[in-house]
Amino acid sequence: MIAAAIAPKIDRAILEPALVQLTRHESRVRRVGVTAVQPGEGVSTLARELAGAYARRGRSAVLVEANWSRPSLAEAFGLTGQPGFADIVAGAVAPSRGVHAIDDNLSVVPAGSPSAIRKATLDDGRVEDFLALVDDRFDLAIVDCEPITEIGDAAALSPFVDGFIVVIGAERTRRAVAQRALADLKAAGGAPLGVVLNRTRRPIPKWLYRWLG
């Protein structure tokens, strides 16, 4: 189950540059949000694989699921029914009960129970309290976030993460939609760390390079 959960599904040419950037800047980047312009662009898959690859390099990583509308980590890691991030934020459990060790270097915090998801909000002070505890235990926290164009929870997490990796689905996301979403994220205080153009068969377009620059 564990091996299947983090088996590579993202092209290595996409995964490796992102991993190199995280490792290079790990002294100042301890919490990374992974989000997308719209649903279905591979955010959860990328977040899982980044966390797994980082852990395989001998560094400790925790994968936190803040994508509460489409939770997937509990099933992927065999944690169905276990408490998670929403339970912690709602004050239903102690933080330690929501963190589940997968192996020596990788832990997972799934979304949590449906009842807690309905009650919890990401502007709660418990979010920062929990992530501060995470900073003490792990080298890196990767937060699986909602899409930018949806509920707004990615923007709500901006004060709590050091920056975002944004996934853009190649050949399915219109340029204007992507540009507007990126601008919205920056306006909300989100620091863009980079963009992953997923499922692409073409070079990265010039407008995206300009944004990255």
Where are the model-predicted features located?
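P-loop/Walker-type NTP enzyme "switch/lid" segment
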Residues: 2-41, 56-139, 148, 159
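Rossmann-fold NAD(P)-dependent oxidoreductase module
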Residues: 53
